[in-house]
């Protein structure tokens, strides 16, 4: 028979052992994640983005512009993207850089033309966390900040405003949040998509994409897909209210 003091000491000992075991069990996934190595994937892409929306500034007013996919060879001087992801367990760090240089011409009433030269750069930095699935099929919540730069020059040719020209530029930042998905069809084919939306210094900012990849060489995939982005920024007469969308092609490497 144990005395009351002995039984009390045993209960305390068992409680400490149970707490210690529970701590090890709870820490197991975190310790496993800590032991996982970082993996990196990403690469360059060409984006055949058509453009539609309104641009303007105080000296020229706001004007509608449009450039369809069929006009890209004539209007796009440069369009390139770089996308990357660093992943460790359920955590990921996301980057996305985009630059588009366009020169569009739109017909105005009375035979006049509007030429719009636009240089746009955008960069996203954020993070994600896997809430469902595993390495082969997963759904992540993601969030971060997207920074924009836009410089535009509007020039009127012909008509009552012929010769009028004006240039302006702006930089702004928006908070973004959304979902990202990845599905490995088999060892060589995979599908990926994301949807992000937000606002901040702009009125609205969104980004949608769907991609398919084929691993043609260990660690390297050919990627094709479709991406659409929109942003509506207006400040002190400067207007950049544009939707860009079109197919993309690229190479993604995994390290």
What are these regions (language model features)?
Residues 36-38, 76-80, 119-123, 137, ...:
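Residues that define the transmembrane beta-barrel architecture of outer-membrane proteins
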Residues 32-101, 184, 250, 254:
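Short glycine/proline- and aromatic-enriched beta-strand/turn motifs that initiate or cap beta-hairpins
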Residues 46-50, 88-90, 97-103, 131, ...:
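Transmembrane beta-strands of outer-membrane beta-barrel pores
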Residues 222-255:
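Outer-membrane beta-barrel translocator/channel fold
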Residues 54-70, 101-118, 149-169, 234-240:
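Flexible, solvent-exposed loop segments that connect beta-strands
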Residues 42-44, 82-88, 125-129, 143-145, ...:
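Residues on the lipid-exposed face of transmembrane beta-strands in outer-membrane beta-barrel proteins
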Residues 90-93, 134-139, 187-191, 219-222:
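Repeated loop/turn-to-beta-strand initiation elements of outer-membrane beta-barrel proteins
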Residues 1-38:
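Cleavable N-terminal export/targeting peptides
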